[in-house]
Design a protein with these regions (language model features):
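N-terminal leader/targeting pre-sequences
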Residues: 17-65, 70-172
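Bacterial N-terminal signal peptides
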Residues: 8-17
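Bacterial N-terminal signal peptides that target proteins for export
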Residues: 1-8
Length: 172
């Protein structure tokens, strides 16, 4: 009888804990340069109703556009960033622009650096998720050498990887 009571109470308490577990509302990737590069910065992802607000601040770039994607693995251990794998694409869609309805979940388009090599980007996205099976948390953000042409499959012809950062849950 005591065992049944204990198991019932334990099940009840676990249910309360799981019900009260909060989904993340903010995530961050701190970008570190790959070998031979000086690109660094941060990208925050903040949940707001039915979308995610993306804010990126990146330095050390050459002036112009640079491809900017979420990649499939949260692994920046290789000196060239290739350990992050390909684009994060849980729904198996074609590569495309960030405003396209059919695109990789990791397609963020381009950041554009000014003459001093700094880029700032702010936009909102309805495809990305901070929780669930298609969550971006635990994956990596990569900044590329060239502009993403938004059409070449599967990567947008964006060239080498200049910086990598793993997306983790941030303090709200």
């Amino acid at each position: 009888m005591k065992t049944k009571f204990f198991l019932g109470a334990l099940t009840f308490l676990l249910g309360i804990c799981l019900t009260n577990a909060q989904e993340p509302t903010k995530a961050i990737a701190v970008l570190h340069p790959t070998a031979g590069n000086t690109v660094a910065g941060s990208v925050t992802f903040t949940k707001s109703s039915d979308e995610i607000k993306v804010v990126a601040d990146i330095t050390g770039l050459t002036p112009g556009k640079h491809g900017f994607h979420i990649h499939e693995f949260g692994d920046c251990s290789s000196s060239d960033g290739n350990s992050a794998g390909g684009h994060f694409n849980p729904t198996r869609k074609a590569h495309g622009a960030p405003d396209a309805s059919d695109r990789h979940a990791g397609d963020l388009g381009n950041v554009e650096a000014d003459a001093s090599g700094k880029a700032h980007l702010e936009w909102s996205d309805k495809v990305m998720k901070l929780s669930g099976a298609d969550s971006i948390v635990g994956h990596a953000v990569i900044v590329h050498e060239k502009a993403d042409d938004l059409k070449t499959q599967p990567t947008g012809n964006a060239g080498g990887r200049l910086a990598c950062g793993v997306i983790g849950v941030a303090k709200p």
